[in-house]
Amino acid sequence: LGKVGAKKYMLYVMDYGAPIGFRIAAKHPERVQGLIIQNGNAYDEGLRDFWNPIKAYWADKSAKNAKALSDSLLTIGATEWQYTNGTRNKAVISPDNWIIDQSKLDRPGNQAIQLEMFYSYGTNPALYPEWQAYFRKHQPPTLLVWGKGDYIFPEEGAHHYKRDLKNLEFHILDTGHFALEEDGDLISDLILQFMKTNS
């Protein structure tokens, strides 16, 4: 952002991108005009059952735990599940999503990269109190849209934002983790109106 000369911006954060965005926001609160949060976690309560094998890897970065993650989370079945679990109608989700994603995941050496990303995500929970303090102190205007069927980042985590953010537009949608797949038009309309109101 510094290289492109961005002085003021809104941050759209989702999944792995949420911790990156929250790090930026906490470091440069004066630059953030608003947050758009889509299934991106900042609370311990938002890391539920899905995360148990990943937490085991954080605690013990062993070959056994790495294999457990590879076998359960880096397969074509797991990638398809991320797109279809919790959705209203799996039939409307294009298979191109998981086929293309998996073709990239299966590149030589990429599995090791994904495992390292799982491991490095473990640095985030320790920063949750800092991000929550940022929310409370600076109160950035925030649009939150969240698929209630998301098993990776369950709805419970979304509701905790209400505790810290007062200027919060809050939407729980009847869809899954990749909420744009079923509700892209609705979410884009919400984003445009939010940006118009808060720019």
Put a short name on every predicted segment.
Residues T175-S188:
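Catalytic histidine-centered segment of alpha/beta-hydrolase-like enzymes
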Residues I191, M195-S199:
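Short, hydrophobic alpha-helical segments
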Residues L1-Y12, Y16-I172, L186, L192-Q193:
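Flexible "cap/lid" subdomain of the alpha/beta-hydrolase fold that forms the substrate-access gate
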